[in-house]
Amino acid sequence: FINRNSNEYTKKIRRKNYGKLFNHVVRNHNDDDIQRFRHLSAKGWELRDLQKIRPDLIHHDPQHFKNRYTVQQWKNPAKTILSHIHKDGNLFIHPDPKQHRTFTVREAARVQSFPDDFRFCGSRTSQYIQVGNAVPPLLAYEIAKCIKNVVFKKK
C-alpha cells in the first residue's frame, strides 16, 4: 500500500513494513441507509436536508435521528469516536460519496491514533467497542510524558 497523501499524522500511525491492514471490513447497511449515505456524502448534507429531494429517506423518527447521520469531512477534524460506535455507526459516514458506507473499525482506530499494525480481536461489534472505549494512544503517550515529568522532576 503506497499512499502519496501521507502527512505527519499518518506517518506516526503507519510504521514502516507494517504488512497487512486488519479490521478494515465494511459493515452491512440496509438499502435506505445506503441511499442516505449517497445523498448526504455527495452534498455534505445533514439528514434534514434530504426532506427536499428524498422525503422517503427521512427517518420515521426525525427528532430522535436528526443528528444521527453525520458525514465526516476530509478537511475538518473527525467527530469524537464514541464508546457506542458499534450501535451509532451512522454518526461516522465515510466522506467519499462513491463509497456509501460508515467507518470501518480500522478507520475509527485511525481517528483514535491506533497504529495501522495494531490488530483488534473478537467480533466486529467487540472491535468497535474496543476502539470506542479506548484512550487514544497518542493522547495516552502525551499524558504519560507529563506524569513522568512531574514524578521525576528534579528538586
Briefly describe each language-model feature range.
Residues 1-155:
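C-terminal target-recognition/interaction regions appended to catalytic cores
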